[in-house]
Amino acid sequence: MAYKGQENLEHLNPRKVGVLITNLGTPDAPETGALRRYLREFLSDPRVVEIPRFIWFFILNLVILVIRPRKSAEAYKSVWTEEGSPLLVYSLAQGEGIRQRLQSKYGDDVVVRVAMRYGNPSIASQLQAFEDEGIRKLVVLPLYPQYSGSTNGSTFDAVAQDFMGRRLLPDLRFISHYPDYPPYIQAMAEHIRAYREKNGSADKLVFSFHGVPKRFLLKGDPYFHECHQTSQLLAKALGLSDGQWMTTFQSRFGAEEWLQPYTDATMKSLPGEGVKSVQVFCPGFSADCLETVEEIDQENREYFEEAGGESFAYISALNAEPAHLDALAQLVEDNLQGFLP
């Protein structure tokens, strides 16, 4: 294997620290071709789909990539903005907000970049940019508060894969999760409290997290437990009693059992249980995206209303709210200790 290296090391800057903020990713456009490229990269990740590669190759290329891109493109069109994909727009705004907060304290010694695990800007391209700037110390923050091998673990894989091709490795701090980080919990509580003060409360507040196959839990993935940990801390911060809130899991894919209760099934059943109004918040999504804007605010709204529900409200993600950016910047700063003078 040929390792990448540079003959001239005079450009190395021992003072500077690179901060890489990452999220899942998004297609370049809400079009079939762009969706096919994005889904191929996403669904080819063995962390995401843990079945034998030989079998999955045929399922992916002969079935999923033939059928799903067109349908997914239509869904993305419903949430696409003039600026582009909501996830990328908000992620870039988050990166800028974190940069401003850190540079106000540390100046140009901290360089912040944003990358996507799948799609653009890629993790590899941003790591290369850090290397080109002579940066030898890195902090990586995946914006998945609750750890799962399919998200946080996959992000580490991508970083490690890039490092495997290098001759000179940087110092690395990888923030693997933050499900109980007090500033994160407080930012969410303030956000929900402000929404409810303006719009009123509902019979039930539902915390909906992205689901994963149940077998991930059975094999030792802590995601299920960390989601419940976040929910419990958030409910406590809001002063909610047990009957006022619940945790559900959305976005299941395929025929196997995923973490339950399912969000869509819950929305269909709540009206029959006497719940006439519901508010949904997604603590695991740091930015609004297809899964929140289309799946929750559109699809699950329909499920609830068609089942007899009277009032459905989606409470937006924290996105680039100041309290959220303060929390993320503080989380990064906590991990800069020893990296800066």
UniProtKB/Swiss-Prot annotation:
Biological process according to GO: heme biosynthetic process
Residues the entry annotates as binding Fe cation: 210, 291
PROSITE patterns linked: FERROCHELATASE
Broad EC category: lyase
UniProt-listed HAMAP family: Ferrochelatase (MF_00323)
Keywords, comma-separated and alphabetical: Cytoplasm, Heme biosynthesis, Iron, Lyase, Metal-binding, Porphyrin biosynthesis
GO molecular function, one term: metal ion binding
Catalyzed reaction equations: heme b + 2 H(+) = protoporphyrin IX + Fe(2+)
Name used for this protein in its record: Ferrochelatase
A family per Pfam: Ferrochelatase
Family label: Belongs to the ferrochelatase family.
Function: Catalyzes the ferrous insertion into protoporphyrin IX.
Organism of derivation: Alcanivorax borkumensis (strain ATCC 700651 / DSM 11573 / NCIMB 13689 / SK2)
